[in-house]
From Swiss-Prot:
GO terms for molecular function: mechanosensitive monoatomic ion channel activity. The keyword Transmembrane applies. This is Large-conductance mechanosensitive channel. Its main location: membrane. It is a multi-pass membrane protein. InterPro entries: Mechanosensitive_channel_CS, MS_channel, MSC/AndL, MscL_channel. Belongs to the MscL family. Channel that opens in response to stretch forces in the membrane lipid bilayer. May participate in the regulation of osmotic pressure changes within the cell. One of its GO terms (cellular component) is plasma membrane. The chain crosses the membrane at residues 10-30, 76-96. PANTHER family: LARGE-CONDUCTANCE MECHANOSENSITIVE CHANNEL (PTHR30266:SF2), MECHANOSENSITIVE CHANNEL MSCL (PTHR30266).
């Protein structure tokens, strides 16, 4: 089997295609969540705690000197990214929870199979032995 044919079979499997679609949708969803946090959640939150813009939170480790730029830790951006992560994690958690719930509904418990002739015979022998032991 040629490498190209093997690769084509691998790439066309349902799991690989599903994974690719998931990655693309996930990337687009990440942009939506980032916008939700940056443009919808953080401004009112900043307003509630005194008109603060979290993006502006930073610590300057070294001021700019001539052509050398300043060294700055932007921890406000980090806080915003933490909010992004929490929202994405919660959304994924809820989606997985919903999928699991739907899968459980699909999986109805299978009826117990009827006992085989051997199992019936063994059960009768067991019952007879119990009766003999109880008489003794």
């Amino acid at each position: 089997m040629s490498i190209i044919k093997e690769f084509r079979e691998f790439a066309m499997r349902g799991n690989v295609v599903d994974l690719a679609v998931g990655v693309i949708i996930g990337a687009a969803f990440g942009k939506i969540v980032s916008s939700l946090v940056a443009d919808i959640i953080m401004p009112p939150l900043g307003l509630l705690i005194g008109g603060i813009d979290f993006k502006q939170f930073a610590v300057t480790l070294r001021d700019a000197q001539g052509d050398i730029p300043a060294v700055v830790m932007h921890y406000g951006v980090f806080i915003q990214n933490v909010f992004d992560f929490l929202i994405v994690a919660f959304a994924i958690f809820m989606a997985i929870k919903l999928i699991n719930k739907l899968n459980r509904k699909k999986e109805e418990p299978a009826a117990a199979p009827a006992p085989t002739k051997e199992e019936v015979l063994l059960a009768e022998i067991r019952d007879l032995l119990k009766e003999q032991n109880n008489r003794s």
